[in-house]
Amino acid sequence: MKKQFQALLLIISILFSIIPQDVARADADLVQPRGTTVAQNETMQKTTFPVHVIHKAGDDKENFVIVIMGDGYTLEEQDKFLQDAAEKARGMLTWSPYKEYSDRINIYAVQAVSNESGISEYGGKSVDTYFHVAAYGKALGFTSGGTDKAKALRAELEERYLDAGANVGTIHVLCNSEGSFGASQNSLFSFSANSEDNQNGTVMAHEIAHSIGGLGDEYERYTNKPNTSDTTNPETIKWAKMLGFRGIGVTQAGTETAFAPSRECMMRWLGQPFCEVCKMELARNLNNTDYVSRPVAIYVADPEISIPHSKTGTLDRDSEKYRISEKNITKANNRDLEFRTVVQNMVNREQHLKMTFRIIGADGTTVKYSEEKKYTIPALANWYDPEAAKESLSITIPDVSGLVSGDKMEGKIVDADTGEVLATDKTAEQAWSMVNLHYKLKKEDGTTEDIPEAETTTVYVPANSTYTLRNPQLAGYSYIGSDSDRNVVNVAGENVDVTYYYQVAAEGVETPK
C-alpha cells in the first residue's frame, strides 16, 4: 500500500504536540521496566537489543537479509513480539516468489523495547515507543528521530552481528497494534501492524514488496513503478515482453489514466498472489548484488501452453479459456499451440537456454510434434535497465491436428551450458516439500538442546528434488556439523528435517565467520 508520506510529513509538527517530549530521549536513556537487563545472553551484549534468528538458511552475505524491528512492544511483551514476527515471516514465505527464494532469504528480529505498549495515532492516543511510529489514517511512519534509531541499529547489526561483509537489505517495522495499518517509506523501511489481515504475513509481504521490489499499488493513480503505466501502447508499455502471458495484459488501475498488468495481484488486492510482472521484479531485486554475493543467475517464469488469444486483454489468473493442459488437449486441434515463458537474466553475463516442446501420443512412443529453439539472453549490464536482459521465449506449432485424449505434452527450458532443466510446462502445478532446519547446541557432555535465539527455518523446495545443506553460522556459536551424512539431501516426502549442531563460541573467537 503506497502511502502518501508527504502528507504525513505535513502533520509531523502536530504529532510533536501530541507525543510527550521525553519520547525523543537518547537510546542510552531508555527506561527498562523493573531494572531488567535487555541483553539476557552474553552473545547478545554486542548489540543494543537481543537479536533473534527467525529464518536463516545460509550466509548473510550470500542471502538477502530482512530485519524485523518491533515498535510498541514493552519488555514484558518481547515473547509476544518474537511470536508475532515469526508468524508474519513464515506466512510471507508461503507467497511466491518469496517461497522459491526461501533458501536465499535470512530474517532476523531485533527486540527493541518500548516504554509503553501500542503506537501513537494522529488525533488520538500518544504512546511512548522506541521508534516513535505513529499512524496517520491507514499509513504508518517514523516521528521524533525513529529513522535515525533504526539506521543506527542496522549499522550495529552489520558491524557486530551479521556474517562478515553482509548488509541489511531492508527493515520491516512490526507495530504492536491491531489496527489495519501498513506502509512502505522507501527501499529501506516498511511497516505493518499485528492486525487480523496480517496474521499470515500478507500485509508484510505486500509492504516489503514495495521496499524490495520497488513495486507500486495497482489501485492508485501513480504510474512511475515497474507494475504501473501511463500508456496502453503494447509496444511501449513497461511489461510489453510479458503481454498475453499468464493473464498479463492491460487493465485500469486507480484512475482512467493509470494502468496495471493484472486484475489479480497482491499489489491490488491483499490475499491474491503476485502477478507475473511483480513476481519477476521482486525476484530480481531479491538477487540484487548490492546485498547478495551469490545471486541466482536467471529467473524463469512458470511456462504455459496456450492457444491464440489477445495479448493486451487481461485474463483471470486461473482462466482455462486459452490455457491448454493434458486434461483439455483436444481443444487445441485446428489451432496454433504455443509453449511460452519469459526470462530475466539477473547477472552480468550472457545466459544460453534451450527450449523444447514435444507432443507424445497416448501410446507413449509416437512423437506427434517436436520443436527446439536456442536463445542467448543478454547480460544484465545495467541494473536499472532490466528490460535489456529480459526475453520472451516461445515455440509455436501451427495448426495442430490429430490430438486425442491421453496425448502428453512435454515442454522444457534447459540451461544449454549445463544441461540443467530450469522449468517445464508442469512447473506451475508442482508440489512443494518443506526442509525444516533445526539449530541445536551440543554440550560438553554430549547432550543437546535447542538454541534459544533461533527459530526452526523452513525452506521450500520442489517435491522429489534435492536440497544442498549450507551449514549457516550463528552469532555467538561455532558450527560443528549436522545430522546428515551427506551434503545434498534427497527430498522425497512432504517434510525433511535436518539438524545443525553448534558449540558456544570460545572467548575471543569472532563470530560469525
Predicted regions mapped to residue ranges:
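Sec-dependent signal peptide cleavage junction
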Residues: 16-30, 34
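Propeptide-to-catalytic entry region of secreted or membrane-anchored zinc metalloproteases
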Residues: 31-159, 417-419
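Short pre-active-site segment immediately N-terminal to the catalytic Zn-binding motif
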Residues: 80, 183-205
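Aromatic sugar-binding surface patches on proteins
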Residues: 378-397
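Conserved "repeat-terminator" motif of extracellular CCP/Sushi domains
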Residues: 432-440, 488-512
